[in-house]
Amino acid sequence: MPCVMNIWTGDGFKDVPADRMGPRLRYKDSIEQILSEPYDKNLVKPCVESKVFGIGVESYTVGSAEFTLSFAAMHDGCMPLMDNGHYHPQEYVSDKIPAMLCFYPEFALHLSLI
Protein backbone atom coordinates (compact mmCIF):
# COMPACT_ATOMS: atom_id res chain seq x y z
CA MET A 1 0.00 0.00 0.00
CA PRO A 2 1.48 3.39 -0.97
CA CYS A 3 2.11 6.19 1.49
CA VAL A 4 1.83 9.92 0.92
CA MET A 5 4.95 12.01 1.49
CA ASN A 6 3.73 15.51 2.32
CA ILE A 7 6.15 18.37 1.63
CA TRP A 8 5.34 21.78 3.08
CA THR A 9 7.05 24.91 4.31
CA GLY A 10 6.38 27.32 7.15
CA ASP A 11 3.44 29.68 6.98
CA GLY A 12 5.33 32.75 5.80
CA PHE A 13 6.86 36.01 6.94
CA LYS A 14 5.40 38.37 9.51
CA ASP A 15 7.62 41.19 8.26
CA VAL A 16 7.47 42.67 4.77
CA PRO A 17 10.24 41.03 2.71
CA ALA A 18 11.88 42.94 -0.11
CA ASP A 19 12.66 39.68 -1.91
CA ARG A 20 9.51 37.69 -2.59
CA MET A 21 10.89 35.50 -5.36
CA GLY A 22 14.15 34.28 -3.79
CA PRO A 23 12.51 32.20 -1.03
CA ARG A 24 10.16 30.62 -3.57
CA LEU A 25 13.01 29.73 -5.92
CA ARG A 26 14.95 28.19 -3.02
CA TYR A 27 11.84 26.25 -1.93
CA LYS A 28 11.29 25.02 -5.51
CA ASP A 29 14.93 23.93 -5.76
CA SER A 30 14.72 22.16 -2.39
CA ILE A 31 11.62 20.19 -3.39
CA GLU A 32 13.21 19.26 -6.71
CA GLN A 33 16.32 18.01 -4.86
CA ILE A 34 14.14 15.92 -2.53
CA LEU A 35 12.23 14.42 -5.46
CA SER A 36 15.46 13.68 -7.36
CA GLU A 37 16.41 11.08 -4.75
CA PRO A 38 15.49 7.53 -5.81
CA TYR A 39 12.28 6.11 -4.35
CA ASP A 40 9.74 3.46 -5.29
CA LYS A 41 7.03 5.36 -7.15
CA ASN A 42 4.61 2.51 -6.48
CA LEU A 43 5.03 2.91 -2.72
CA VAL A 44 5.60 6.66 -2.26
CA LYS A 45 3.29 9.40 -3.54
CA PRO A 46 4.89 12.82 -3.00
CA CYS A 47 2.64 15.84 -2.62
CA VAL A 48 3.04 19.55 -1.88
CA GLU A 49 0.79 21.30 0.62
CA SER A 50 -0.14 24.95 0.34
CA LYS A 51 -0.37 27.32 3.26
CA VAL A 52 -3.04 29.95 3.70
CA PHE A 53 -2.27 33.64 3.61
CA GLY A 54 -3.80 34.77 6.90
CA ILE A 55 -4.92 38.35 7.23
CA GLY A 56 -2.73 39.94 9.89
CA VAL A 57 -0.64 36.78 10.24
CA GLU A 58 1.85 36.93 7.40
CA SER A 59 3.07 39.52 4.98
CA TYR A 60 3.36 36.84 2.32
CA THR A 61 3.36 33.05 2.10
CA VAL A 62 6.13 31.18 0.28
CA GLY A 63 4.14 27.96 -0.26
CA SER A 64 0.93 29.60 -1.44
CA ALA A 65 -1.82 27.74 -3.28
CA GLU A 66 -0.62 29.24 -6.56
CA PHE A 67 2.92 28.03 -5.93
CA THR A 68 2.05 24.48 -4.90
CA LEU A 69 -0.59 23.92 -7.58
CA SER A 70 1.84 25.16 -10.23
CA PHE A 71 4.66 23.03 -8.85
CA ALA A 72 2.52 19.88 -8.85
CA ALA A 73 1.28 20.61 -12.38
CA MET A 74 4.84 20.93 -13.68
CA HIS A 75 6.31 17.88 -11.89
CA ASP A 76 5.01 14.51 -13.01
CA GLY A 77 4.31 12.21 -10.09
CA CYS A 78 3.88 15.03 -7.57
CA MET A 79 0.33 15.78 -6.49
CA PRO A 80 -1.16 18.73 -4.65
CA LEU A 81 -2.43 18.34 -1.11
CA MET A 82 -5.49 20.28 0.02
CA ASP A 83 -5.78 20.96 3.76
CA ASN A 84 -9.32 21.98 4.68
CA GLY A 85 -7.88 24.15 7.47
CA HIS A 86 -5.76 26.22 5.06
CA TYR A 87 -8.47 28.17 3.30
CA HIS A 88 -10.36 31.32 4.08
CA PRO A 89 -13.61 30.87 6.04
CA GLN A 90 -15.66 31.68 2.92
CA GLU A 91 -13.94 28.93 0.86
CA TYR A 92 -14.94 25.28 0.85
CA VAL A 93 -12.62 22.44 -0.12
CA SER A 94 -15.64 20.47 -1.36
CA ASP A 95 -16.17 23.13 -4.04
CA LYS A 96 -12.52 22.94 -5.08
CA ILE A 97 -12.43 19.14 -5.57
CA PRO A 98 -14.28 19.05 -8.94
CA ALA A 99 -12.01 21.84 -10.25
CA MET A 100 -8.91 19.91 -9.17
CA LEU A 101 -10.15 16.71 -10.81
CA CYS A 102 -10.22 18.51 -14.17
CA PHE A 103 -6.40 18.77 -14.06
CA TYR A 104 -5.08 16.16 -11.62
CA PRO A 105 -5.84 12.41 -11.77
CA GLU A 106 -5.37 12.29 -7.99
CA PHE A 107 -4.57 14.57 -5.08
CA ALA A 108 -4.26 14.27 -1.33
CA LEU A 109 -6.58 15.65 1.33
CA HIS A 110 -5.73 16.67 4.88
CA LEU A 111 -8.99 16.78 6.79
CA SER A 112 -9.31 18.42 10.19
CA LEU A 113 -12.45 17.67 12.13
CA ILE A 114 -13.84 20.59 14.06
Which residues are covered by each model-predicted region?
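Active-site acidic/histidine proton-transfer and metal-coordination neighborhood
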Residues: 1-79
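Structured core elements
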Residues: 47, 81, 108-110
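Amphipathic alpha-helical packing elements
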Residues: 68-69, 77-97
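A short alpha/beta connector and helix-capping loop motif
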Residues: 89-114
